[in-house]
Amino acid sequence: MATCLLMSTFTFIRCSVLKWGSGSSLPQEQKEKITKGPGLGDFISGEVESTDSWEDYMGKLRLEKGDKRLRLPPWLKKEIPIGKNYHSLKGTLRELNLATVCEEAKCPNIGECWGGGEDKTATATIMVMGDTCTRGCRFCSVKTARSPPPLDPNEPVHTAEAISRWGVDYIVITSVDRDDVADGGSAHFSECVKEIKKRIPSMLVECLTPDFRGDMEAVATVAQSGLDVFAHNIETVKRLTPFVRDPRAKYDQSLQVLSHVKKTVPDMVTKSSIMLGLGETDQEVRTAMEDLRRAGVDCLTLGQYMQPTKRHLKVQEYVTPTKFKHWEEVGGEMGFAYTASGPLVRSSYRAGEFYIKNLLNKKRTEATLDTSSQES
């Protein structure tokens, strides 16, 4: 799966969408944090060991020759609650025959994201074009096949119907790779966006897409579908790409996809993600970030890779929260509009959606003001 959403157990997708207004119970301090942009603390919820224990952790963080696997450090241990909305959301998905990357990628955050809570609305990242991928990335737990079942023509309508029932205002649509389909499924992807916008015009839609085999017409089809954020993940650094991703997923090809989106729709907010802990060096991470900036990428997320099953790539290193904070600062210095970097950060992470939602609303307001001034 080329989009892969920083897949594997790495797809700890944190997709809860928080809504506030005049009647919100959110404290003012938390509202300000979200408006200004998140820090590591904003990305971690549930019961996590005290940060005092992080710096004192004496366990091994790097895999050495002969080691079977690394022990999970304290900063990656948290409670996984299941809220009252969990079963309702799951029932909607089953009724409409839809798949989510939350389930297919065995995301351990599924209970929290789907469950919601007093201050947040449950949501999920919808995975369209089926639950079977034509590619086999070595970090991803989504099932694969050369010839998956045909695309469901009713899926765009069903997707819009499901989302309308959830009452959210920001949704992420991703997909498996469909190399068996002529256009890679770009027209189908586009129809999903159009149906959502037709049913809920105010909905902010982020699409996390495949590379469409480098077919730039297919990329443009999705970019011009009416979405608000175009996301495509490079997943890892250039040197590790042939080892980590499917051979058909090329590092430079992914950069070209992101660049072409900006050429097609210059004002489009673009986004990408990098997994850490696969054996990359600091210089390689920095170079990948620089490559993304040159491609015009606005938003970047970095998070810890975790091995989904014994058949997948082993974790080579558990990156510390301090190091993730360093990369967040580097991202800001490089000029990314938004950099989310932390052990539990995932490419569709909740706090990122807050920030991007504010960015998009600001753009809408500016566009309205420009139109008004021109008319006057």
Curated annotation (Swiss-Prot):
Cell compartment(s), UniProt: Mitochondrion
Any single GO CC term annotated in Swiss-Prot or TrEMBL for this entry: mitochondrion
Pfam families: LIAS_N, Radical_SAM
UniProt record, GO biological process: lipoate biosynthetic process
Binding site for [4Fe-4S] cluster 2: 133, 137, 140
GO molecular function: 4 iron, 4 sulfur cluster binding; lipoate synthase activity; metal ion binding
Keywords: 4Fe-4S, Iron, Iron-sulfur, Metal-binding, Mitochondrion, S-adenosyl-L-methionine, Transferase
Cofactor(s) needed by this chain: [4Fe-4S] cluster
The UniProt record lists the keyword Magnesium: no
Pathway as given in its UniProt record: Protein modification; protein lipoylation via endogenous pathway; protein N(6)-(lipoyl)lysine from octanoyl-[acyl-carrier-protein]: step 2/2
Residue ranges constituting the Radical SAM core domain according to the UniProt record: 116-337
Remaining remarks: This protein may be expected to contain an N-terminal transit peptide but none has been predicted.
Protein name: Lipoyl synthase, mitochondrial
Protein's organism: Branchiostoma floridae
Upper taxonomic lineage: Eukaryota, Metazoa, Chordata, Cephalochordata, Leptocardii
